Design a protein with these regions (language model features):
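Acidic, low-complexity intrinsically disordered segments
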Residues: 1-57, 62-66, 70
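Glycine-rich beta-alpha loop elements in corrinoid/cobalamin-binding modules
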Residues: 1-14, 232-267
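Extended hydrophobic secondary-structure segments that form protein cores and membrane-embedded regions
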Residues: 4-6, 42, 119-121, 219-225
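Short, glycine-/Ser/Thr-/acidic-enriched flexible segments
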Residues: 10-12, 45-50, 59-62, 91-95, ...
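Ferredoxin-type iron-sulfur electron-transfer modules in oxidoreductases and energy-metabolism complexes
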Residues: 32, 65-77, 81, 102
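Short glycine-enriched, charge-decorated loop/helix-capping segments at active-site entrances
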Residues: 59-61, 158-163, 234-240
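Conserved SAM/AdoMet-binding glycine-rich loop
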Residues: 76-219
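Contiguous mid-protein beta-loop-alpha structural module that forms a pocket-lining wall or clamp
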Residues: 197, 217-218, 223-230, 241
Length: 267
């Protein structure tokens, strides 16, 4: 009866219930007034197997589960009966065991004359292959988003985003060679253990991408690290706003010098 005092015996224990997902969740109503107008959004996967240390989706929705391939094809066909715009949704759609088959399925429809516009949630660097890019380009995408999170391999290892610089540069080359016009790189500032050298690594990465891929448009979007409950970084404090603003100004200034558009949100 004392306000603010927790008494366990009066509280219910909530058990997490994880089940297989055999049914596909998709947009029930198509309208011009939606955030994505007349777009049929299809959930391909739920959860994520990568377990980046900052990511709530990785831990809240464990384990990674995928919609059955045949079910996805049926739902895609259902959507295309009502609109030509489809979007594939999931925290890690490229981990679907039939992701490349789905891309091929849609690509063949386009090659057979069907007008389809397809978009995907951001892809991992190691998901960029010639076939995936060709499908995106055929479906009307000119640019795509890559979540690299940090500029240095050291800091990516800290957050369990195990991507090398060479993988990033290879993804850019594949994208350019197969028709994409540009990438937007998504990253964070204020990640635990981040140093000035990690920020400078972002600038060096941008310089090399521009140098090796003339005419390929790149931009950066940054947000600040915010600790999430139920993740390995839940007890890491958020960096103070003045420090984040200083880092933000540095990145914006240095990227602008080399002709790269960037914006920072959530400070």
């Amino acid at each position: 009866e004392i306000d603010g005092v927790y008494v366990p015996k009066y509280s219910k224990i909530v058990n997490k219930h994880t089940k297989k997902i055999s049914e596909c969740i998709y947009t029930p109503i198509l309208t011009e007034d939606a955030f994505f107008p007349n777009t049929f959004i299809i959930e391909m996967t739920r959860g994520c197997a990568n377990r980046c240390g900052f990511c709530l989706a990785s831990y809240l929705n464990l384990p990674l589960r995928s919609i059955p391939y045949e079910t996805l094809k049926q739902v895609i066909d259902l959507g295309l009966e009502n609109t030509n715009k489809i979007a594939l949704l999931g925290a890690q759609i490229s981990a679907h065991p039939h992701f490349h088959d789905i891309c091929k399925y849609i690509y063949e429809k386009i090659q057979n004359g069907q007008n389809i516009e397809m978009s995907v949630s951001s892809l991992r660097v190691d998901a960029i292959t010639p076939d995936v890019v060709k499908t995106l380009v055929a479906a009307g995408q000119k640019n795509s988003t890559l979540a690299i999170e940090a500029g240095s391999e050291r800091l990516r290892r800290v957050i369990n985003k195990n991507l090398t610089e060479e993988q990033i540069f290879n993804a850019v080359k594949i994208a350019k060679d197969n028709g994409l016009k540009g990438f937007k790189f998504y990253g964070m500032i204020g990640i635990p253990t981040e140093t000035q050298a990690d920020l400078e690594a972002i600038i060096e990465l941008a310089k090399r991408v521009k140098k090796e891929n003339k005419g390929f448009d790149i931009s950066f979007g940054f947000s600040s690290f915010v600790p999430k409950p139920h993740t390995p970084f839940q007890w890491c404090g958020r960096e103070d706003s003045k420090s984040l603003e200083k880092k933000s100004n540095f990145l914006l200034k240095e990227l602008r010098k080399i002709g790269v558009t960037a914006h920072v949100s959530s400070i």
